Amino acid sequence: MDSNVITSLTFKTSKGRTSPKFGYGTSDSVEFVLESKGCAIVGFYGWYKTGSGYTTALGAYYYPMPLPPSSEKLEAQGGAGGAPWDDGSNFEGVRKIYIGTGEIGIVSIKFLYENDIHEIIVGDHHGNKNLLRHEEFDLDYPSEYLTSVEGSYDVVPGSEEDEVMIMLKFTTNMRTSPCYGLDDDPSFVLHKEGHKIVGFHGKSSTMLHKLGIHVLPITHS
């Protein structure tokens, strides 16, 4: 075979996926990369060898990709006690929420996230790991996503005059979770119209004191 033909191709996407190698390589193959930083490939052109049908050259057409939307951090709500924590905002959504509840409210909370290359990220455990009661709220991700959180906080026995979270309730684009903790009227709502929740931050000690959210615009791509 004429050495001046393309013997293999591999494709990469913006989501970090790499295709299998199509064709085969040889020990003396010359590698090339078609890429333009910040652009997507929207078409191809090239040359082929008449008679054999082999492709001898390949080029690409590029178009600038829109910048990904920036996340926004909404202020945490709750009491002033506890140490600050922040799971970050480098996620595409929330898959599961683990809520530890006790007789006086929310003892702990932990979140399971997914990022833009479909990796599952387990967030840190915030609050008392020695749970008295453990509940889970599963989302049907990616079709289901969080849109708001309702909660209430108050001073309870053992909180040393620091207000702690006593109730949380989560709403998605499809449904509303049960009320976790005490059955109390909400004193705050974490929500931004047209956005989904992709991360959490707050303050905790042996209880959850404060909770805030990171949000991204809802897209339907």
Swiss-Prot record:
Which keywords does this chain's UniProt record carry?
Lectin, Repeat
Write down the Pfam families for this protein, in alphabetical order.
Jacalin
Q: Which family does it belong to?
A: Belongs to the jacalin lectin family.
Q: Where is the Jacalin-type lectin domain?
A: 1-64, 71-217
Spell out the PROSITE patterns in the cross-references.
Answer: JACALIN_LECTIN
PANTHER family found in the cross-reference section: JACALIN-RELATED LECTIN 22-RELATED, JACALIN-RELATED LECTIN 3
Q: Which InterPro entries match?
A: Jacalin-like_lectin_dom (IPR001229), Jacalin-like_lectin_dom_plant (IPR033734), Jacalin-like_lectin_dom_sf (IPR036404)
Provide the protein name: Jacalin-related lectin 47
- SUPFAM superfamilies found in the cross-reference section: Mannose-binding lectins (SSF51101)
GO molecular function terms noted in the UniProt entry: carbohydrate binding
